[in-house]
């Protein structure tokens, strides 16, 4: 089995689907993150060309990645005037730390939630709408 797949009783996770879930982004945004991470600070047009996507699609993905804290925008000043932006991905190790921390929080919250469930409340919730 691939190291990028995780089978659980409910589903099979891919790393990009896990990133999408943790960071609230689209699976397609993850490709943009890894392109920037691999190639270093990049302009939107360069990213779009490398991954064969429309500029506007890449712009939306980069905005999602910035909102999630995975990518930062930096202004580069041109010597004779003007500027342009490049986008830089946070290091992969930092991304992994955030994912692990988020998963630990989820796990702790789920354990607490299950611990606090009362049988009577669960029965009432799931059986009250059943017609006799």
Swiss-Prot record:
Name of the protein in question: Uncharacterized protein MJ1503
Species whose genome carries this gene: Methanocaldococcus jannaschii (strain ATCC 43067 / DSM 2661 / JAL-1 / JCM 10045 / NBRC 100440) (Methanococcus jannaschii)
Entries under Pfam families matching the protein: TrmB
SUPFAM superfamilies linked to this entry: Winged helix' DNA-binding domain
